[in-house]
């Protein structure tokens, strides 16, 4: 089973292999993490967070998790009231057959627990008896299909037996708790008498059976009937012994119903926790990412897929991070959110030379990194390029230009992006391509 961060990585992989257009560019995220310290898995997780810049994928996974939780809540509530109602019906008469009530309360639970143990020791694949989550829903959008595939793949993992086991035990615990509450409530407000009947069992055999049944509850302090009460209880209800019989009933539910289920649930949760899988970094998709990080030289033909270096080079660290928009305000006021998986402080819009100069002075006083937003659909002029150079030189932590485009790739945008690439390269500035346009361009070239 995968934790939420690894689920996000796998979801990104599935979508990327299908040509999905993300809110963040996968290639730019890969290049941005080239010089970042950390283990390979940590960097791949961070890369997925950068690709999911608008958090849509994380929110989708969270909705699935929340939906599963509330589905369990509904099932648990139903199980509780089912157990409560069944027990209420079993104890509808004043004179109760003890063994009949006990069998009605614990019979099915004990049988299903035995079936689970048999499947466990026989190593039966429980996935054969349950439908895959991929068969429960149908969705046409790529994200929904990818989520279904993600959980279908997870369903085939060996550790799914512990997930199913923990869920089953938790629902049975709710059922048993409903039964216990019903028993306690009825014993509190009604006067019952207990008897027992048997055609085959003698008094001695019945006494022995009750002694064996009562051993554990008596050790835990529950009142239990003695041999005299057992013998006198045959076909007859005795109010004087009712408390002992009721104590044995409650103790049996606790000791032979709730306690074994609770232990089984704990075992499943522990084994589920210890069986958490790491990412399979041997998959071709991850190997391609790792090779890009290991490759120190980037071919000139792939220039638009990289984050160019500036002096000082941009290194993702804990330095203050500021974001500023040049010339005019962008329609998305949070255009900087999630860029390079960092939290950027909005410094507003620098619309004239005075505001650029003020920001330049502030940058020289604080070692901040700067994200500069410019409209990619405008032709780069000398004034804007001069402002970019001044701000990049003043940013002690480095600066990167984010080219912004309202729509996807078009012939006009492609031409203007090429002008921006040439101009920024001549200035020695780093830049990030428009996320959607960069991805559409690569898909078009494939």
Swiss-Prot record:
Subcellular location: Membrane
Stored InterPro entries: DUF2868
Tagged with keyword Membrane: yes
Keywords for this protein: Membrane, Transmembrane, Transmembrane helix
Keyword Transmembrane helix set for record: yes
Protein origin, superkingdom: Bacteria
Membrane-spanning intervals of the chain: 69-89, 98-118, 169-189, 247-267
Membrane topology: Multi-pass membrane protein
One CC-aspect GO term: membrane
Pfam name, any one: DUF2868
Protein name, UniProt field: Uncharacterized membrane protein NMB1645
Organism of provenance: Neisseria meningitidis serogroup B (strain ATCC BAA-335 / MC58)
Lineage per the UniProt record: Bacteria, Pseudomonadati, Pseudomonadota, Betaproteobacteria, Neisseriales
